A protein has these predicted regions:
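Conserved short submotifs of the Hanks-type protein kinase catalytic core
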Residues: 69-83
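Activation segment signature within eukaryotic-like protein kinase domains
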Residues: 101-102
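Short beta-strand micro-motifs within the conserved protein kinase catalytic domain, predominantly
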Residues: 57-72
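Conserved catalytic-loop aspartate of Hanks-type protein kinases
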Residues: 177
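Protein kinase catalytic-loop region centered on the HRD/HxD motif
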Residues: 107-117
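Conserved activation segment of eukaryotic-like protein kinases, specifically the C-terminal portion
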Residues: 152-165
Length: 189
């Protein structure tokens, strides 16, 4: 296992900067509290996908509010993985590994689709390698649950891998993730 430790805000300078920009204490508190809520949403999405073998597994987490000051300390215990970027720097990838990556990500996206989740940011930085020749999808920070959306969905993601309908802020569905995966696999070949 690995433990990811996060502090929201990272330090008091973030609070001071917001205060200098004219925000009052309550607004600053709400601003950072929303960050924590977004992180909790990402954790809950990943927990809903826990049974999927190609999704990064969060084993446990704890969010601890700080006493008498604005801030939260967040501890996330997850499986120990290597990010794909580091894997590529250390090893490169054969065609067979790129195919394996593609198949693993298709399984991950199938699990997302079954839970009505659009990842919206399929890219090298959000894929991990477990050391057993298996790749896993992580970082659901900008994913969107379909049932929570109405007509037009917001533009999120990385432009290099973004489907045209997302870029144009048109209505889209889970197929935008398949498009992004295809672009990424093409670049890896």
């Amino acid at each position: 296992s690995a433990v990811k430790v996060m502090h929201i805000p990272k330090d008091n300078s973030e609070i001071n900067d917001l205060h200098r920009s004219g925000m009052d204490f309550d607004s600053i508190h709400t601003y950072f509290e929303d960050m924590v809520k977004n992180l909790l949403n990402e954790i809950q999405i990943m927990e809903s996908l826990k049974s999927a073998s190609n999704i990064v597994v969060i084993e446990d987490y704890q969010i601890i509010p700080r006493n008498k000051e604005i801030g939260w300390d967040i501890y996330i215990r997850m499986e120990l993985l290597q990010d794909l970027g580091t894997f590529l720097e250390d090893h490169g990838m054969t065609r067979q590994q790129v195919l394996r990556l593609g198949m693993d990500m298709c399984q991950a996206l199938t699990a997302c689709e079954q839970e009505h989740i659009i990842h919206r940011d399929i890219k090298i930085d959000n894929i991990f390698f477990n050391g057993f020749h298996s790749f896993k999808l992580g970082d659901f920070g900008i994913s969107k649950q379909l049932e929570k959306t109405q007509s037009a969905l917001s533009q999120k993601g990385t432009n290099m891998y973004m489907a045209p309908e997302v870029f144009r802020a048109e209505k889209y569905d889970h197929t935008v993730d398949i498009y992004s995966l295809g672009i990424m696999l093409y670049r890896l070949l």
